[in-house]
Amino acid sequence: MKAQPKASHFIDGEYVEDTDGTVIESLYPATGEVIARLHAATPAIVERAIAAAKRAQPEWAAMSPMARGRILKRAADIMRERNRVLSELETLDTGKPIQETVVADPTSGADAFEFFGGIAPAGLNGSHIPLGQDFAYTKRVPLGVCVGIGAWNYPQQIACWKAAPALVCGNAMVFKPSENTPLGALKIAEILHEAGLPKGLFNVIQGDRDTGPLLVNHPDVAKVSLTGSVPTGRRVAAAAAGNLKHVTMELGGKSPLVVFDDADLDSAVGGAMLGNFYSTGQVCSNGTRVFVQKTIKDEFLKRLKVRTEAMLIGDPMDEATQVGPMVSWAQREKVISYIEKGKAEGATLIAGGGIPNNVSGEGYYVQPTVFADVTDDMTIAREEIFGPVMCVLDFDAEDEVIARANASEFGLSGGVFTADLTRAHRVVDRLEAGTLWINTYNLCPVEIPFGGSKQSGFGRENSLAALEHYSELKTVYVGMGPVVAPY
């Protein structure tokens, strides 16, 4: 098989196999071919991973932030040296085109290790509080054992985005990738340990929806960070609340992208395409509700149709391919069902809408699809599709579009295209979302916080803000004089 790992799990610095677990077949989305067979973690494997993390964490926390950061930066260097190999593995794992993975996936993961490794000495400072004769100080301390639960759209990136801040704060992590994309996280574990990470600090176990509760409910776990769907997030948050665990949730969205009539039209079309078709539309922050001012709608749709139909769909390993398959057969069927709902509910199909005829019939392909004349009450405008389906809605005025954009249970992200920067700032101030873009879309460098509001989650990934979610403040009051007691 093309990508068979040494074993299913990586625990305490070594590969571990346990064939008692349910078989997980890793399928190449472009062909449906089995490229690896792994096993889900049994309860014994879960216990072993958490025990290793708990055992290793105190000594790691006692190291200086500089020493911890040095290891992460070394891991970043190794990832960059092996970018091509990691990118090819990511393409096999997800089906995303190699032209995407070589610039986006391992690269972003390496950036996370470099960023958090570099800010460790300065980012983990406390404060000094003068109190007259006395004083107090605060310090940031690690939480302990953290659990990371990944999604299947950016498996390597997500593993690094969670591991980097957790480790630099002095925690240990047990990471469970999606059963659809089990391979990348194992390579990240290898690289971290090659870079000098002590054993037991980053463990990877495979599993499905039955494995997550074993991790989330474990009494030795202090923190859970999930990237996934809203229903999964609700279940995990409810379980974590029972033991008062720290939680970060990066969930789904149905984000608005607003195009005003003074926008650079080609840039707006390009932004809408990036915000709907990159990674075959499997991006949580996608601006899938594209609100276009009526005066430019026809020209916007004309240019969008031409560019969408010119996209190259094909073999993800071909450097020319711009659109790959969905991650799984089930996801493709879900997307096709939403396209059919859009047609049935009266939306106008502008481009795509089916399965391309130039690819393997065994692959999980869907054409990039554009609907116009979409109304706010249509299913495709309300529910997260998580595929290459763009909904174009029209509007007249600013107040109107803001109210409609906010009329959603989600609040992950949003965007505005306009030449009027005063209006741009005014609009983003009123949009109910955690991450917003002006005259661009879906750029997420590790230097900036990323996360949502409302049903799209809470907490933040990346930037200095992430340190707050993998540590807690300890306050120390220092008395400098005799104790005065009334008794």
Curated annotation (Swiss-Prot):
The modification Cysteine sulfenic acid (-SOH) is found at residue 284. K(+) 2 binds at residues 244, 454, 457. Keywords: Metal-binding, NAD, NADP, Oxidation, Oxidoreductase, Potassium. GO terms for molecular function: betaine-aldehyde dehydrogenase (NAD+) activity; metal ion binding. Belongs to the aldehyde dehydrogenase family. Dimer of dimers. This is Betaine aldehyde dehydrogenase.
